[in-house]
UniProtKB/Swiss-Prot annotation:
The lineage of its organism: Eukaryota, Fungi, Dikarya, Ascomycota, Pezizomycotina. Mn(2+) binds at residues 114-115, 118. Binds 1 heme b (iron(II)-protoporphyrin IX) group per subunit. It comes from Emericella nidulans (strain FGSC A4 / ATCC 38163 / CBS 112.46 / NRRL 194 / M139). Induction: The genes forming the sterigmatocystin biosynthesis cluster are co-regulated and induced on oatmeal porridge or the fungal isolates were grown either on oatmeal porridge or in YEC medium (0.2% yeast extract, 5.0% corn steep liquor). Expression is positively regulated by the cluster-specific transcription factor aflR that binds the palindromic sequence 5'-TCG(N5)CGA-3'found in the promoter. This is Peroxidase stcC. Peroxidase; part of the gene cluster that mediates the biosynthesis of sterigmatocystin (ST), a polyketide-derived furanocoumarin which is part of the most toxic and carcinogenic compounds among the known mycotoxins. The first step in the biosynthesis of sterigmatocystin is the production of hexanoate by the fatty acid synthase (FAS) units stcJ and stcK. The polyketide backbone is assembled by the non-reducing polyketide synthase stcA by condensation of the starter hexanoyl-CoA and 7 malonyl-CoA extender units followed by cyclization and release of norsolorinic acid. Belongs to the chloroperoxidase family. Gene3D superfamilies: Chloroperoxidase-like (1.10.489.10). SUPFAM superfamilies: Cloroperoxidase. It is an enzyme of class 1 (oxidoreductase). Pathway: Mycotoxin biosynthesis; sterigmatocystin biosynthesis.
Amino acid sequence: MLLKSIQNIVCGLVPTFFLFGSAAAELDFEQWHPAGLGDLRCGCPAMNSLANHGFINHNGSNITVNEVIPLMQEVFHLSEELATIVTGLAVLSADDPASGIFNLDMLNRHNIFEHDASLTRKDFYLGGDGHTIDQPTLDEFLSYFDGKEWIDLNDAAAARYARVLDSREKNPSFLYQDQQLITSYGETIKYFRTMVDPRSNKTSAEFVRILFTEERLPVREGWQRPREEISGFSLASDVVQLALRTPEKFIGMPFDQRPFAEQAFDPLPWQRPPIWTPPNYPGFSKRHFSELVGRFAKKALPFRA
């Protein structure tokens, strides 16, 4: 349903994007100015970096689908299909998605583009606003790369999952179902792949630090546009690899369903069986059954997320 909404909105807007042409030769990465008073920003460092470099309106307002899609292709080497999906998710946060126009601060609306367990922002419940970098959160995220010149997918997985655990512990309204889970995995893969060295399949820790702290593309330090196109298929494949490096047993599962061992054993949401309702025996309630199975699951599972 979500992808269908994106398709319906964006397909009517993208024909004119071909008029944009190839912008790579015209983009001046040396031009960079951080957000000033009154400038609008969101929780996505990639989007914010486009504004800080002046590739989209520096004030963060009146951004169009027709300009963002080709920029995603030219700057980050996303495929047309993936650039359209990412931009479509952004425009869904707009007051009028069908217009194809949005402001960056609209992306801060909770649980559309923005989500709990951000890599650098506080959860809304904990006082976050979606766009302001929270220094303790940023420090925790970057601490997983301390002392390393290069980071691999294991490092990226550990840093991401630490944020999930932290939010789960501190935020009683923490929401981490399939939409938030896929968004969380996807954003980690996107920064990892756009900064990766194809020879080693590792990413410069310095590039990641600059992107997340300054919201700047680290061209001065040697970053270049990825050589290989990042497609929806390659993103999905990398998401699976990231998931396999993450000790989540209840990934994407609503908390009230987690006592059931049948679902607890499934590591990924697309491998989950349908929700099973236990038999209704007189004097033996669903709560009793849940407690019984929960005790069994605790003994049967060596660890649980």
